[in-house]
């Protein structure tokens, strides 16, 4: 039923209506920008207008009370304008330079968020940005690890790299709570991926009551499921199962969780940028770390070892994979203190046609 004068579907607002007036006025007409200090970026327009972007790291999930606190601060210092980045940083827009320090102090006092997450490529001084990650235990139905808890533990340990410019080049860290990879773990400098190591255990009673068996069987990408028509349930071929969780998505009677065997793998060397060389996919360097909530000490230790070994030995502007290619993987494992095992050797080989013929870069002439 349509009610006269009532509109319920507004859709996304036009983005230009939400821009700070200085940004809207100078849209596409910026002269240059510079990093004043970690977390503060000065942008200068061709018209001479200046605006400062002040960045703070925030959790991915925020309460409405915290959001309201940040909005109150935005009303006070940035004309009521703020935005969140794709890496879960909140940014304020300040036109009066004298307000910057007061803004930073008030955010830290009221909500406790650190200022940082920027870099200065001209000087070759880089800070660590926030971690992009998936839902984890709080919402996702197939996670092998938590997301928010691990990100909090890792960033607490790497806090100094967020608030200062101590790194030689850009470094992106990401996390996905299972191999479905809602996060950008396939192409990040350092990536944490949740992995299941045991197949689902069918709950026959739940399958009979809640599941459509043909759809569940068809959802398996490796053909590891077969219908058990006699008992009206599903059988799992353990040898074919790759622990992806697709069956649990279709059927609540196929739980995949295993507190003892679920854990995380660490990957390194991915990147999306085409600067200097083509994009790269991440490689596994730690095949499995157990779940150790609430602070995941072993996982955090490995991530810090990798980051600090790279930071201490890389050249300026040298991404992690570029550093590895220069020194070699053997030297990488020596410097990071990680153990090389047979689990790191990939037994999958893509077809020669696909591997050799398809482009991996957009850097070509028409």
UniProtKB/Swiss-Prot annotation:
Binding positions for [4Fe-4S] cluster 2 per the UniProt entry: 220, 241, 244, 247
Cofactor annotation comment: Binds 2 [4Fe-4S] cluster per subunit. Binds 1 siroheme per subunit.
Cofactor: [4Fe-4S] cluster; siroheme
Record: residues binding siroheme: 182
Keywords assigned: 4Fe-4S, Heme, Iron, Iron-sulfur, Membrane, Metal-binding, Oxidoreductase
Organism field: Archaeoglobus fulgidus (strain ATCC 49558 / DSM 4304 / JCM 9628 / NBRC 100126 / VC-16)
BP term (GO), one: sulfate assimilation
Location(s) in or outside the cell: Membrane
Protein name per the record: Sulfite reductase, dissimilatory-type subunit beta
Pfam families, per database record: Fer4, NIR_SIR, NIR_SIR_ferr
PANTHER family: SULFITE REDUCTASE [NADPH] SUBUNIT BETA (PTHR11493:SF47), SULFITE REDUCTASE [NADPH] SUBUNIT BETA-RELATED (PTHR11493)
